[in-house]
Amino acid sequence: MIYLDNAASTQIHEDVLTSMLPYLKEQYGNASSIHRYGRMSRKAIEKSRKQIASLINADPSEILITSGGTESNNTVLRGIPMVNASSNIITSSIEHDAILEPCKQLSQNGLEIKYLQVDKFGMIDTSELKNNISDNTCLVSIMFGNNEVGTVQKISKISQICHEKKIPFHTDAVQTIGKIPIDVKELGVDLLSISSHKLHGPKGVGALYIKNGIRIDPMILGGGQEHGLRSGTENVANIVGFGKACEIAKNNLTENMAYVTKLRDLLIKKVLDGIPEVTLNGDPKSRLPNNAHFTFLGVNGEDL
């Protein structure tokens, strides 16, 4: 079988699995405990935090470990402080449901949500973004790379616009992490969501980059783990696996990106040249290396 659904999930890397096993068998201490087993777990978590941070050029203190992209996105949308009673959030019409569904509920609770439309390639109009920002805007959230058509947004430009207006900018980079280089300092983003299982790590763990100085109110309260931003006993094995996956992704990013891009372009050429009435969806140039999305006229997608 040829697996072509890596946008949905990836196979766990053998080295990732190996790194996790000791924390499922022998090193089972609670990271909040002060005894030796607890200290070993804490040390493993902090090492992983550094590995995660290194992949996106963040400081380890800026990494909040979560259960995945969905929780990271919800944490931002529900945790960002409101400007006033008339606050609004700006996002796009083609976000993942992990953004759209919380926005829908927030809207039902009285918060104004502004949805930016996209062009035929799935790209937002940055001029429209500028025009929609007001004194009441408390957050802009635009997906980095689209999970369906693969379009990569102009993140640096969006960051610049938001910073000129002094608005925090969040991007959902779950589909982008490990596929193309991400440097949060260079991009200028304030908040960024990532997930382990999209880059050959385990499911059920992810992270939220929170730039130093950005305030987020906690969504999960309890024992005060993750500097009080996400309470709950840490899943040490999964966090260790996530860290290892980030390390592997960083070490192989340039080589893998070139190889996958070459395969993608070959697939696109073969399909467009060899099959009639086919349309390539998404931006033809600004797209994820691992994404090729087509419409075959008269053919149901599920049947295909």
Task: List where the protein language model places each region.
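Pyridoxal 5′-phosphate
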Residues: 1-304
